[in-house]
Each structure stands twice: as structure tokens, then as C-alpha cells.
Amino acid sequence: MRTLNVALGDRSYPIHIGAGLLARPELIVPLLRTPRVAIVTNTVVGPLYLERLTAGLESHGIAVSTVVLPDGEAHKDWTTLNRIFDMLLESRCERSTTLLALGGGVVGDMGGFAAATYQRGMPFMQIPTTLLSQVDSSVGGKTAINHPLGKNMIGAFYQPRLVLADIEVLNTLPDRELSAGLAEVIKYGLIRDPAFYAWLEENIERLRARDPEALAYAIERSCRNKAEVVAADETEQGERALLNLGHTFGHAIETGMGYGEWLHGEAVAAGTMMAAELSRALGWLTDDDVNRIEALFVRAGLPVRAPALGIERYLELMAHDKKVESGRLRLVLLASIGKALMFGDATAGEIGAAISRRCG
């Protein structure tokens, strides 16, 4: 097992990475305020892992309440969130009860948001079961639900007390979901870790083959990058915004196509290619750089072209982005492979041209 620490003073917490961690309730139990938990999972993950987690906790004298949500981004909304609140209230969970989010990014985001708001805040822990959630969404305290006008528009920063990343659960992850997670792994190399990017170019096939050593290394390296950024900028006032490379374009794809049609990682990959096109047009990336980025996404099984929603529709959707400031769209772009920057002076024409080069 490998352990990292997210350094946030008295709200610091560990990230445990390894095989078989779901069968180790002793990693969870000492961090509970009271011997009671509420587990949030979904219809895909629950049948695979809920009984194992519940049995382990109950063997340590922990009382367990559960709710099983419908699966998918299309259900990341108020209606589904209220099912969590219903379970918490009907089970008479208290502010000291710990909520465990067992699932991918949707479960983690909604479970975390429920924990942040139930009785004004209850402790929670992340038990991510997809590659994307293990390397990105479970770390850093971003919680949210979607709105018809934009992704993750209603939420809160609320840190977990523990992240438990069991790499064995990735063996049941569909290939498409694994590739989607690789988009966020590649992102860390692009924005701040060129040596890791070079490693990925050498080892991407090992990751797709689910080589346990390669996966453990990539997850640890990704989480280390994320933890360093979050410790320096928890609420995204500066450097943390760079973690959103490809996300402004990508969220437009997800919203425009309808939540769940494109996986988040797929949209991030296509969105990153749009950001790379704009970075090339501004004179920062070379043709070789863009070709390297495209080649790695393709080898990872990810799309490098986006749906043809129309330039005006893209710009309309991007206007709702959380990085818009004083009406100005600020984009995360690449100065080079391994170095990202925030740029707010791109014209609508320049942005539209970058989009058009990657549409259809």
C-alpha cells in the first residue's frame, strides 16, 4: 500500500493506494467519529462491492445504512441527491455519522455534496471505484451536481477525511471507462509533469492492459500532483484552475450532447485537443507538440475530435463556465508539454477557429 497526504492543516487527510483495500476496514474505522456510517453507491458498483464493504465494517461493530442510486451522469441532479437525504433522514443519521461514497465520480460528487450540506456538514470518505475518480475527482474536495445549463454548477468545496483507492476494483471497470480515466492521468503530465508525460508515452499500453504495477504508479503520481496543487490552492483561486485543462471545452461537449452521452474523460480529451489547437495558434505549441498529444490520446483509446454542435453553441455553453470572470472567458492553455497557463485574451474568433479544427 502507498499512502500520500493532502496537507490542509487540521483538515489534512490520507490517500491510500493499493490492492485489496476494500477488505481492510481497519483503514476506515479509526477515523470514524461514531460507530455508524451511511454508504452511498449505485446500481453498477453496489452489486459488486457493497456487501464486501458492509460486512467488513459490521465485523468491527459499525452500524451501516445504505442507498443505491441509479448509475450515470444523467442522474447527477437534485432528484437523485434527495434520495441521499431521504436515506440519511429516514435512518436518523446524525451530524457525527460518516458518509462513505462508494463509486465513481458521480457518486463521489453527489455523496460529498450531500455530506457538505446535511445538518450543515457531516464527515465523509471517498472510496473511488473508477480510474478517473481515483486519480482526480475523489481528491481535493470538489463536490457538485449538474444543472441543465451547465455541469457542476451547484456544489461546494468539502474535503473528505480519507481517500481509499483499491486498484483491484479496476479489474471490473469497462475498457471505455478505463480509457476515460486515462484522460485525467495524461492531463497531469501536460500541465505540470513533463517527466510523467514521457513515462506515459512509454507505458500507456501497460495501463490499458491493467498492469497492476503501472496502474499503482500512475495513480500515485497523479494523486501526488493533485495533492500538491490542492494544498497550495484549495479553493481554486490560482494554480488549481490549471487542473481544468480541456474542461471548459469538455463541459460544453457534455452539456451540449446531453449528460452521459460522452464520458467526462472522453470530453476532456477532445477538449484538450481544442486547447492544444488554440495554444498552437497563439504560437506556444509546435506542430510536433500537438501531434504528440494527439498520438497519446489515440493510444489511450480516447477521441481527439468533438461533436459538431456548431461554433455558436459551443461559445454559448462555454459562457457558463466557472472560470468566466467579469464576463471574460479564461481558458487553461499549454505553453509547452508540461506547463499550463491561464489565458483570458483569446478572441471569439480564435476560440471558434480552434473548435472548428477539432469538430466533426
Curated annotation (Swiss-Prot):
Listed EC numbers: 4.2.3.4
The record's annotation in Gene3D superfamilies points to:
3.40.50.1970, Dehydroquinate synthase-like - alpha domain
Residues binding NAD(+), per UniProt: 71-76, 105-109, 129-130, 142, 151
Q: Which SUPFAM superfamilies match?
A: Dehydroquinate synthase-like
Q: Where in the cell is it found?
A: Cytoplasm
Query: What's the source species for this entry?
Result: Azoarcus sp. (strain BH72)
Q: Which GO terms describe its cellular component?
A: cytoplasm
Biological process (GO) annotations held by this record are: amino acid biosynthetic process; aromatic amino acid family biosynthetic process; chorismate biosynthetic process
Q: What is this protein called?
A: 3-dehydroquinate synthase
Q: Report the cofactor remark.
A: Binds 1 divalent metal cation per subunit. Can use either Co(2+) or Zn(2+).
Matching NCBIfam families, A to Z? aroB
* Keywords tagged on the record: Amino-acid biosynthesis, Aromatic amino acid biosynthesis, Cobalt, Cytoplasm, Lyase, Metal-binding, NAD, Nucleotide-binding, Zinc
Identify the domain of life. Answer: Bacteria
Free-text function comment from the UniProt entry: Catalyzes the conversion of 3-deoxy-D-arabino-heptulosonate 7-phosphate (DAHP) to dehydroquinate (DHQ).
Q: Which family does it belong to?
A: Belongs to the sugar phosphate cyclases superfamily. Dehydroquinate synthase family.
Q: Which residues are noted in the entry as Zn(2+)-binding?
A: E184, H247, H264
PANTHER family with a match to the protein in the record: 3-DEHYDROQUINATE SYNTHASE (PTHR43622), 3-DEHYDROQUINATE SYNTHASE, CHLOROPLASTIC (PTHR43622:SF7)
The cofactors required by this protein are:
Co(2+); Zn(2+); NAD(+)
Q: In which pathway does it act?
A: Metabolic intermediate biosynthesis; chorismate biosynthesis; chorismate from D-erythrose 4-phosphate and phosphoenolpyruvate: step 2/7
The GO terms describing molecular function are: 3-dehydroquinate synthase activity; metal ion binding; nucleotide binding
Question: What catalytic reaction does the record list?
Answer: 7-phospho-2-dehydro-3-deoxy-D-arabino-heptonate = 3-dehydroquinate + phosphate
